[in-house]
Amino acid sequence: MLQTDNLTAAQPQRIVAAQTASAQEELLERALRPKTLDDYIGQHKAKEQLAIFIQAAKKRGEALDHVLLFGPPGLGKTTLAHIIAKELGVNLRQTSGPVLERAGDLAALLTNLDPHDVLFIDEIHRLSPVVEEILYPALEDYRLDIMIGEGPAARSVKIDLPPFTLVGATTRAGMLTNPLRDRFGIVSRLEFYENRDLTTIVSRSAQLLQLDMGEEGAMEVAKRSRGTPRIANRLLRRVRDFADVKNNGVIDAAVADAALSMLDVDAQGLDVMDRKFLEAVLHKFGGGPVGLDNVAAAIGESTDTIEDVIEPYLIQQGFLQRTPRGRMATERAYLHFGLPVEK
């Protein structure tokens, strides 16, 4: 049984946020993380491709081509990076774009790699230009070109590197420079999960946590998880708390529904912030079109928060449209709130 008593994460501002809420939540994610491609649920196309590329690299005794994983947060990019290293039977070194401030930071990592090791850089779109320039020859030729000294005494030193695999992860592939993007031989986009796969993930997590949970309870959690395993596992922990107090730890569909309703997560995975936004568009602006600034003023949120946090899921699920004239509620939004559809 996993020991999780001291790993319970504090509830984030939005329980349906896809970002990791805390260090404690990250620790629990690691405990629940699948270790092999066979255990990894969902992302069938990416998983099938990686399995073939990994087997081919091992068969030839070569380093795997550099891998770029992109897609919304919480879908398993970090998990896949760990699995790639595990399947290759090599070490994984992990860092993130913002941490690599100077060329020396990257050089220290690269020169300590063993042959065929995996270097995982999360948020790779946030690499500084200086570090990115150093990375190019390392990716192409397994070589570092570093300037030592300053002024007339400066000289270039070339350092040979062992063959290695860079796995880069990003939620914003469009922010990668073309030269960096072109150096990845394998590019995989991770998609939002189907409810069927999320139900399997919730059931697996419940089993690891030794929870008394039936399939209907897992389905109830899955369908409110916004297609995101990280959210599913977070909701599962809160449902577990509710079941421990209200139903002797037994989680069925009714208990899951009651727990998630108490948390203001409705049957479509919308929370208070989502509903507040949609209700403003529907009731205050007649369903739209309405400008972003007007909606932001009406609900007391910044335009950045609306664009980056609220709107993506609503658009992806078909509750909202962005048009040249502004935001418009869709037919699905009217039906969700029990309103007559505007013609």
Curated annotation (Swiss-Prot):
It is an enzyme of class 3 (hydrolase). It is found in: Cytoplasm. GO terms for molecular function: ATP binding; ATP hydrolysis activity; four-way junction DNA binding; four-way junction helicase activity. The keyword Transit peptide does not apply. Keywords: ATP-binding, Cytoplasm, DNA damage, DNA recombination, DNA repair, DNA-binding, Hydrolase, Nucleotide-binding. SMART domains: AAA. Residues 267-343 are annotated as: Head domain (RuvB-H). ATP binds at L32, R33, G74, K77, T78, T79, E140, D141, Y142, R183, Y193, R230. Its EC number is 3.6.4.-. Gene3D superfamilies: 1.10.8.60, P-loop containing nucleotide triphosphate hydrolases (3.40.50.300), Winged helix-like DNA-binding domain superfamily/Winged helix DNA-binding domain (1.10.10.10). Has 3 domains, the large (RuvB-L) and small ATPase (RuvB-S) domains and the C-terminal head (RuvB-H) domain. The head domain binds DNA, while the ATPase domains jointly bind ATP, ADP or are empty depending on the state of the subunit in the translocation cycle. During a single DNA translocation step the structure of each domain remains the same, but their relative positions change. The RuvA-RuvB-RuvC complex processes Holliday junction (HJ) DNA during genetic recombination and DNA repair, while the RuvA-RuvB complex plays an important role in the rescue of blocked DNA replication forks via replication fork reversal (RFR). RuvA specifically binds to HJ cruciform DNA, conferring on it an open structure. The RuvB hexamer acts as an ATP-dependent pump, pulling dsDNA into and through the RuvAB complex. RuvB forms 2 homohexamers on either side of HJ DNA bound by 1 or 2 RuvA tetramers; 4 subunits per hexamer contact DNA at a time. Homohexamer. Forms an RuvA(8)-RuvB(12)-Holliday junction (HJ) complex. HJ DNA is sandwiched between 2 RuvA tetramers; dsDNA enters through RuvA and exits via RuvB. An RuvB hexamer assembles on each DNA strand where it exits the tetramer. Each RuvB hexamer is contacted by two RuvA subunits (via domain III) on 2 adjacent RuvB subunits; this complex drives branch migration. In the full resolvosome a probable DNA-RuvA(4)-RuvB(12)-RuvC(2) complex forms which resolves the HJ. HAMAP family: DNA_HJ_migration_RuvB. This is Holliday junction branch migration complex subunit RuvB. It comes from Neisseria gonorrhoeae (strain ATCC 700825 / FA 1090).
